[in-house]
Amino acid sequence: MAAIRKKLVIVGDGACGKTCLLIVFSKDQFPDVYVPTVFENYVADIEVDGKQVELALWDTAGQEDYDRLRPLSYPDTDVILMCFSIDSPDSLENIPEKWTPEVRHFCPNVPIILVGNKRDLRSDPQTVRELAKMKQEPVKPEQGRAIAEQIGAFAYLECSAKTKDGIREVFEKATQAALQQKKKKKSKCMIL
């Protein structure tokens, strides 16, 4: 039986951990150096609810310089991973301010999984100290859940690509969301 194909697009601020999340899931290795993404594609196979799914993973650039290029990734998307970094409250603020309006414009009705990346840094003493200098603190789980509810996300999950904690759950949930979407999307327009 052929695998079901689904397209996943990942969005979020620059340096919030999008590429690491995709690489750890698809290649099971954590990249040592940060290189800003312009546009990358990966493919990974996952089994969810007894179904074999081939996930096309579309990485995007979060930097504002790419705001006009990024929409080229959106056509035929089945699920969106919308990411922020737990060590960057500003990146969470940009979820309802920037990312949700953009995604809802180009991908109306596509399920969104809100993902808090870099969960390991929530309790990292150096991260906590650095944020305290700016009168900030790491994002709390309830803050993430509140934003997920506000934007109508399918789910809210947290993970750490560095420790591999929660990675599989993110992609299982995203695949479930993409598979559920299929049932609703059957009616296509016909011109006679």
From Swiss-Prot:
Modified residues (Cysteine methyl ester): C189
Family matches, as Pfam families: Ras (PF00071)
Disruption phenotype: RNAi-mediated knockdown predominantly results in embryonic arrest with surviving embryos developing elongation-defective uncoordinated kinky larvae. Defective ventral migration of P cells leading to defective gonad development. Defective establishment of anterior-posterior cell polarity in one-cell embryos. Abolished cortical contractility in early embryos.
Record Gene3D superfamilies: P-loop containing nucleotide triphosphate hydrolases
Lipidation (S-geranylgeranyl cysteine): C189
Effect of G14V: Constitutively active. Normal P cell migration. No effect on viability or fertility
This protein's UniProt keywords: Cell cycle, Cell division, Cell membrane, Cytoplasm, Cytoskeleton, Developmental protein, GTP-binding, Lipoprotein, Membrane, Methylation, Mitosis, Nucleotide-binding, Prenylation
Binding site for GTP: 12-19, 59-63, 117-120
Protein family: Belongs to the small GTPase superfamily. Rho family.
NCBIfam families, A to Z: small_GTP
Protein name: Ras-like GTP-binding protein rhoA
